Curated annotation (Swiss-Prot):
One of its GO terms (biological process) is negative regulation of DNA-templated transcription. Keywords: Repressor, Stress response, Transcription, Transcription regulation. It comes from Mycobacterium avium (strain 104). Disulfide bonds: none annotated. The gene is hrcA. This is Heat-inducible transcription repressor HrcA. Negative regulator of class I heat shock genes (grpE-dnaK-dnaJ and groELS operons). Prevents heat-shock induction of these operons. The keyword DNA-binding does not apply.
Length: 343
């Protein structure tokens, strides 16, 4: 890329940075005064004319200044040399806050609240997807001789409790055998494989009485737990930030709120996140959803080095602090993965 192209990108970078900070259209005189561009105001005006002709900036109404277009934001994000990381104190505060979560639900609630505060946007966290989870532990507890409590714990920290009503009473020895058989069938397996294993076990021990009946009833309840679609659950925080930024959205605020409530668009975008640590920025039309006009989403996956638990990110107007938002999303995702992976 030639020096003129590089110079024009520096002009674009300055326009994006100033517009994000001030919300005001940016003129050539302002750019020369605020930034060390090393050229005259006339040269900057010429560069802005080229950027406008190429679709990177536009003139709103009768203002003499210019604002970035979605194409301009895209170029700015694609050419971010580096994203300033959060300070050590900020990272430590995030880690301590998330580690204080008592269980999966609490950790995710803390994460979404924290991310909304850090970015001043709408924060979204997807519950761990079942397809990537492994059964870490199964507990079978007798509430009465004919009533059991099944507790399934996955490696992502998800805890599911189910009641099993037996057709007949079982004694302590039979309870121990039932716990052992179900544990051998489930523990250490991905949930998809575990559901097959428990169904096979029920088929092998099919019997109207004795332990076969207990296994069959337990299997029916466990299958409900193992195939339940928790990946369709989202946590959101900071929706009040939408109204604070209402003037920045190019489309209808109502349509954005409806899209968030329906969750379909958001789930589709989060489902595309398959690599922990990789942050994706979708600007305006790139969300491929009419309801999301004028919005950007910064998303990533969270999990361990070898397992993705789910997706997370923020939604806000295209006039967004992209470097700061990317850094915050990446940091919170990393610590969610560490906290859940250590449990």
């Amino acid at each position: 890329m030639g020096s003129a192209d590089e110079r024009r990108f520096e002009v674009l970078r300055a326009i994006v940075a100033d517009f994000i900070a001030t919300k005001e259209p940016i003129g050539s005189k302002t750019l020369v005064e605020r930034h060390n561009l090393g050229v005259s105001s006339a040269t900057v005006r010429n560069d802005m004319a080229v950027l406008e002709a190429e679709g990177y900036i536009t003139q709103p109404h009768t203002s003499s200044g210019r604002v970035p277009t979605e194409k301009g934001y895209r170029e700015f994000v694609d050419r971010l040399d580096d994203v300033k990381p959060l300070s050590a104190a900020e990272r430590r505060a995030i880690q301590n806050f998330l580690e204080s979560g008592v269980d999966l639900d609490d950790v995710l609630r803390r994460a979404v609240r924290l991310l909304a505060q850090l970015t001043r946007q709408v924060a979204i966290v997807q519950y761990p997807t079942l397809s990537s989870s492994t059964v870490r532990h199964l507990e079978v507890i007798a509430l009465t001789p004919a009533r059991l409590l099944m507790v399934v714990i996955t490696d992502s920290g998800r805890v599911d409790q189910r009641i099993v009503e037996l057709g007949d009473v079982i004694d302590d020895h039979e309870l121990s055998r039932l716990r052992e058989m179900l544990g051998q069938a489930l523990v250490g397996k991905k949930l998809s494989a575990a559901s097959v294993a428990v169904a096979d076990l029920a088929e092998q021990l099919r019997s109207p009485d004795g332990l076969g009946d207990a296994v069959g009833r337990s299997a029916t309840v466990l299958l409900e737990s193992l195939v339940e679609h928790s990946e369709e659950r989202l946590l959101m925080g900071g929706t009040a930030n939408l109204t604070r930024n209402a003037a920045d959205f190019g489309g209808s605020l109502r349509s954005i709120l409806e899209a968030l409530e329906e969750q379909v668009v958001v789930l589709r975008l989060l489902a595309a996140q398959q690599e922990a640590g990789k942050v994706t920025v979708r600007i305006g039309y790139e969300t491929a959803a009419e309801q999301m006009v004028g919005t950007s989403m910064v998303t990533t996956a969270y999990g361990t080095s070898d397992t993705v638990y789910g997706g997370m990110g923020v939604l806000g107007p295209t006039r967004m602090d992209y470097p700061g938002t990317i850094a915050s999303v990446a940091a919170v995702a990393m610590y969610i993965g560490e906290v859940l992976g250590a449990r």
